[in-house]
């Protein structure tokens, strides 16, 4: 894949048919850690970053777009990506034990939640384990993590403004938006400013936490995660991913490997990874 200079990104990527006209990609100001590539519309920022990883780019390579034609989230689920959101993926190459790698997605969720709260202090984002970001019980942002080619692609989709065309989301959560207002025939100057702030704040928060995670592991973030944890001390039903069995219990938190701590009916706390179970329902 050809790696373009910053000035060459204006029209890279295919524009979706019938999509609103977008004058230009965002132009966030970020630290030298990030090699930022900004686009108006692409098929998938994840695919761009994954191809870059295969080509051997160093960590910090980052792609951000205002629209995607083929965006996806965890476990390949479709992530609708119309104008109104910000879709960002970045490459990291952490040298850590394999069991530590899944916790990077939890660290990313903390970075995204913190960044969005900086942009809008009243949104009070919470985290749905392992790594979705909620606001007022609606899905505000989704995060994916894929390991390949000696590195990791972290993808983040944020609902900033409501798109003109209504869309549906998989799962039991409705959609939430960071800001009031609807995107109709393109982005206003104010909307572009806010979306630029989202990317800048998110990458700044991620860079800071990534460095700490490399040195201290996820244990250094457990208290922060607990403060934003939407499930704490709630009774839940959990389904095994590779079977039909359902587990009932009270969610007590997460451990240093990012596993959900579930107290069963006899008082035993059992750790469960996101590769083993997913939460199907909560008692409010």
Task: Give a label for each model feature.
Residues 2-17, 21, 96-98, 102, ...:
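Long, positively charged amphipathic alpha-helical accessory segments at protein N-termini or as interdomain linkers
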Residues 1-120, 282:
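N-terminal lobe of the biotin/lipoate ligase/transferase fold
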């Amino acid at each position: 894949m050809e790696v373009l200079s910053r000035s060459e990104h204006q029209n890279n990527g295919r524009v979706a048919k019938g999509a609103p006209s977008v004058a230009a990609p965002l132009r966030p100001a970020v630290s030298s850690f990030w090699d930022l590539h900004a686009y108006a519309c692409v098929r998938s920022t994840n695919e761009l970053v994954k191809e870059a990883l295969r080509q051997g780019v160093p960590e910090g390579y980052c792609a951000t777009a205002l629209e995607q034609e083929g965006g996806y989230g965890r476990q390949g689920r479709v992530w609708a990506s119309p104008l109104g959101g910000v879709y960002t993926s970045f490459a990291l190459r952490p040298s850590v034990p394999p069991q530590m790698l899944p916790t990077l997605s939890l660290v990313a969720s903390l970075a995204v939640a913190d960044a969005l709260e900086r942009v809008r202090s009243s949104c009070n984002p919470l985290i749905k384990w392992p790594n979705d970001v909620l606001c007022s019980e609606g899905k505000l942002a989704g995060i994916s993590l894929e390991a390949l080619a000696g590195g990791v692609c972290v993808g983040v989709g944020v609902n900033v403004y409501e798109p003109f065309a209504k869309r549906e989301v998989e799962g039991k959560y409705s959609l939430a938006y960071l800001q009031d207002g609807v995107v109709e025939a393109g982005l206003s100057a104010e909307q572009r400013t806010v979306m630029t702030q989202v990317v800048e704040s998110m990458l700044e928060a991620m860079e800071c936490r990534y460095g700490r995670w490399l040195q201290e592991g996820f244990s250094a973030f457990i208290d922060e995660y607990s403060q934003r944890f939407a499930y704490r001390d709630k009774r839940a039903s959990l389904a095994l991913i590779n079977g039909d069995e359902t587990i009932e219990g009270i969610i007590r938190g997460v451990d240093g490997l990012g596993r959900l701590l579930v107290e069963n009916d006899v008082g035993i706390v059992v750790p469960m990874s996101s590769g083993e179970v997913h939460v199907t329902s909560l008692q409010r």
